């Protein structure tokens, strides 16, 4: 039972780290990255659809993306979705493809992006600590119900703390890498 709690907690912490990593990928760094469009939705036959599912996105140059819609009729809605997103980019429509030039980030904008990255990292660490708290509550309940002794539960709590520290450290590393990437000119 203790092993199940530890395994479940570790799995949920791992998922949280992965979610945080995916969140940080969407932060614009001044380099072209197709993943920056993962959260951009366009109306497609009345259904909000990610533009990554409506088009192919390629990176011909370090600061340019080319978006080629699978259906030319969806070009306008994709263009509007990008323009209305909070990415701060402006697509150019040449009739066949959309070209998106990624502007160089200003020092101030870089610092803002670092703050956003740190905020997302902190959210990830809070989620990990919430998983830890829930695991601790489950362990205490096992002890209270008399299923396991104090020593076994204390050892499990210590193990849960080690697991928590490991995943919090992973989030810190991911955020530090993103910060370095953002501050690189």
From Swiss-Prot:
InterPro entries: Ribosome_recyc_fac, Ribosome_recyc_fac_dom, RRF_sf. Responsible for the release of ribosomes from messenger RNA at the termination of protein biosynthesis. May increase the efficiency of translation by recycling ribosomes from one round of translation to another. Its main location: cytoplasm. GO terms for cellular component: cytoplasm. One of its GO terms (molecular function) is ribosomal large subunit binding. Keywords: Cytoplasm, Protein biosynthesis. It comes from Corynebacterium efficiens (strain DSM 44549 / YS-314 / AJ 12310 / JCM 11189 / NBRC 100395). It is found in: Cytoplasm. GO terms for biological process: translational termination. Belongs to the RRF family. This is Ribosome-recycling factor.
């Amino acid at each position: 039972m203790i092993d199940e709690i530890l395994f479940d907690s570790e799995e949920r912490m791992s998922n949280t780290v992965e979610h945080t990593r995916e969140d940080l990928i969407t932060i614009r760094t001044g380099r072209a990255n197709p993943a920056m469009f993962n959260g951009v939705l366009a109306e497609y036959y009345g259904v909000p659809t990610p533009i990554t599912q409506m088009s192919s996105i390629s990176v011909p140059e370090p600061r340019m993306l080319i978006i080629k819609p699978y259906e030319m009729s969806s070009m306008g809605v994709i263009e509007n979705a990008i323009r209305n997103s909070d990415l701060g980019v402006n697509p150019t429509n040449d009739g066949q493809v959309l070209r998106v030039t990624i502007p160089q980030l200003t020092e101030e904008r870089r610092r803002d992006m670092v703050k956003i990255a740190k905020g997302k990292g902190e959210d990830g660490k809070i989620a990990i600590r919430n998983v830890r708290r829930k695991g601790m509550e489950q362990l205490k309940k096992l002890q209270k119900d008399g299923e396991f002794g104090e020593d076994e539960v204390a050892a499990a709590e210590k193990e849960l703390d080690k697991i928590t520290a490991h995943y919090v450290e992973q989030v810190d590393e991911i955020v530090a890498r993103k910060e370095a990437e953002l501050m690189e000119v």
